[in-house]
């Protein structure tokens, strides 16, 4: 059984790194009520900026897959495995959505995805080794920081890029729920230095992924 699970997670990891992700939910689209007229064409600068932001979001989902796969494998609790697995499935939707949007913007995922994935996998295993409550706290803090990034992206994305905005808005809804579920399952608040280190690492990743 563990071997089957390991093979399944390995397959998911390969899909994460190669950009071949499965969608369990359809691609979010702008609400009809928000679309009163045809959106103007994005300028080359707006298209490039949207692509950079969506590439950052795609990298975040690559990392989320690795984190939750590692944490799922590290815990012995069936109920916590279910928590991590549910989050991973929805994050795989995010991965597929952002990949689709990058393609529509005539752009590409980060060239460093294997590096991001490997690093996040190691961090997830380390968090899992510290115990379930710490691991859940790490999940909650990760989602909290992702939520802040998405808020920032909603402020930065061009108003005309309704498609990207619809994706980011749904991602934000999901991330809030994942963080809430982690705390309700027994997660603890991480110490301030740990949260600060996570922000510093995230800043390096986002700045790099925007371009590469």
UniProtKB/Swiss-Prot annotation:
Family annotation (InterPro entries): COQ7_proteobact, Ferritin-like, Ferritin-like_SF, Ubq_synth_Coq7
Known catalytic reactions: a 5-methoxy-2-methyl-3-(all-trans-polyprenyl)benzene-1,4-diol + AH2 + O2 = a 3-demethylubiquinol + A + H2O
Record keywords, A-Z: Cell membrane, Iron, Membrane, Metal-binding, Monooxygenase, Oxidoreductase, Ubiquinone biosynthesis
Chief subcellular location: membrane
Compartment(s) of residence: Cell membrane
Listed pathway(s): Cofactor biosynthesis; ubiquinone biosynthesis
Cofactor mode of binding and number, as noted: Binds 2 iron ions per subunit.
One Pfam family from the record: COQ7
Membrane topology: Peripheral membrane protein
GO molecular function: 3-demethoxyubiquinol 3-hydroxylase activity; metal ion binding
GO cellular component: plasma membrane
Binding residues annotated for Fe cation 1, in chain numbering: 61, 91, 94, 175
Region Disordered, residue ranges: 21-42
EC number: 1.14.99.60
Residues at which Fe cation 2 binds: 91, 143, 175, 178
Tree of life domain: Bacteria
An annotated GO BP: ubiquinone biosynthetic process
CDD domains with a match to the protein in the record: DMQH
Needed cofactors: Fe cation
Function: Catalyzes the hydroxylation of 2-nonaprenyl-3-methyl-6-methoxy-1,4-benzoquinol during ubiquinone biosynthesis.
NCBIfam families the record matches: DMQ_monoox_COQ7
Homology family: Belongs to the COQ7 family.
Protein's UniProt name: 3-demethoxyubiquinol 3-hydroxylase
Name of the gene: coq7
